[in-house]
Amino acid sequence: MIKNNVFSKAAITGLLLIAVSLWMMAAGKVATSEIWMPDGFKVPILALEFGSSVAEIQKIVISISANANANILFATQIDMLFAVIYSLFLFFALRAIYTITNLNQYKWLALLPILIMAADIAENFQIVNALGNFEINLWVLKIATWIKWLGLAVAFTAVGRFLITTGRYFDKVLALSTYVTIPLGVWAMFAHNGINEVFAMLFYLLFPLTIIYAWFPGVKKKG
């Protein structure tokens, strides 16, 4: 099955991505009831990523217990590895689409995950600084955060643009789901409430669905 699969590299990387994702979620699991977060936020790490000011970020960090801080810090460090793996997954997926379609736009879009990875790592460094009570650069955090999230939206929309051309129902549902990401991301960029988490959580759905597609694409390798 995997031998003739044009998405084989993405499929295998996807399994590693799932494993690291589960590790990261387990490591960062904390009781959130005592953590102060802005209205609409329920996930501490997302509240930190989308922090609107240094004072707000510091208020969140101060409310986090020492044990919870250690867990979130460890999960953030794992996220450095996670960023590399999901970027590889997207790179392999977009390269596979380029192989199938021979459209140059996918050849160049396959480079987008490199920018996303760099932004995610820069964002994580700022969060590590915040958790360690070191100085943070709010503009670096904001710019890196939105390059990452909007970059993911563009990457998945590009995948969706290919999937909409196939005949399978699953592919079309996945494609339509990716089309929501850019408008939702633009809305979230100018908001500071629950819509930020809805936007981020959408990718928790899109990644596993795209991994499933990578394993069962219905497209065989040529030659």
Where are these regions (language model features)?
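Membrane-interface loop-to-helix entry segments
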Residues: 73-88, 140-154
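Interfacial helix-loop-helix junctions of multi-pass membrane proteins
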Residues: 125-140
